[in-house]
Regions:
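Short, acidic Gly/Pro/Ser/Thr-rich loop/turn segments
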Residues: 29, 86-88, 161
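Glycine/GP-enriched mid-protein hinge/lid loop-to-helix segment characteristic of carbohydrate kinases
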Residues: 3-16, 32-38, 42-44, 53-55, ...
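A short acidic Gly-Thr/Ser loop motif
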Residues: 22-27, 155-159
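Acidic active-site catalytic centers that drive phospho-/nucleotidyl reactions
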Residues: 23-25, 35, 88, 131
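Short loop/turn motifs that cap or connect beta-strands within the blades
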Residues: 46-48
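Residue-level signal for inorganic ion chemistry
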Residues: 31, 81
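Glycine-rich phosphate-binding loop and adjoining helix at the ATP-binding site
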Residues: 50-62, 66, 75-79, 85-150
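Short, hydrophobic/glycine-enriched beta-strand segments
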Residues: 19-23, 80
């Protein structure tokens, strides 16, 4: 990837607004800190603990946020979580059940629970995105596709996901775009 990596140092950089970015998976959670320009710290990996109890999962999210806050060395104004569905992205509430991951946090507002465990994030804004959409937007804004008007991203992991981006925004309907931008149910041939 063509992302810029940088460890934050120096007076001016300390004063920059920082964002904690988390890619929440079923096996591991990847995280780093970024500024508005996409300058970021090295990606760190943490165990997901996705099959544990409610308290252990929430405590794990809090622990990860605290560790990344130390790397931010400045003001954290936002937390972005790329997380698989089903999930209520607008309200930050997991709707996962029967997937052998994150069942214990079904119906729990994550922003409230993480802020209760990490009071230093009290004024930080949380944004939740579907994991494949977050990847696609990152590629569109900062990655190898930043000069493209339209892109299709396909991710294969535990499951398979897809996202369409046009002019820097995700597209879920329209000509050539299947419902929700999901290609997994499209016939081959």
């Amino acid at each position: 990837m063509a992302y810029k990596q940088k460890k934050y140092r120096g007076k001016d950089e300390k004063e920059q607004k920082k964002y904690i970015l988390l890619d929440v998976g079923g096996t591991e959670i990847k995280g780093n800190v970024s500024d508005r320009n996409g300058v970021r710290t090295k990606i760190r990996k943490f165990p997901a603990q996705a099959q544990k109890s409610t308290e252990k999962i929430l405590d794990n999210f809090a622990k990860i946020c605290r560790e990344l806050m130390r790397e931010a060395d400045g003001s954290v104004v936002g937390v972005g979580m790329a997380i698989p569905g089903p999930f209520d992205y607008e309200n930050g509430i997991s709707r996962m059940q029967g997937l052998n991951k994150y069942d214990a946090i079904y119906g729990i507002p994550l922003e409230r629970e993480i802020k209760a465990r990490v009071p230093e994030l009290g004024s930080a804004r949380f944004l939740f995105l579907h994991d494949i959409e977050a990847f696609a937007l990152g590629e569109s804004w900062y990655g190898n596709c930043r000069d493209a008007d339209k892109i299709l991203c396909v991710c294969i992991g535990t499951g398979a996901g897809s996202a369409f981006v046009e002019n820097g925004k995700t597209v879920k309907t329209g000509k050539g775009v299947p419902e929700n931008g999901w290609i997994y149910q499209q016939p081959f041939g």
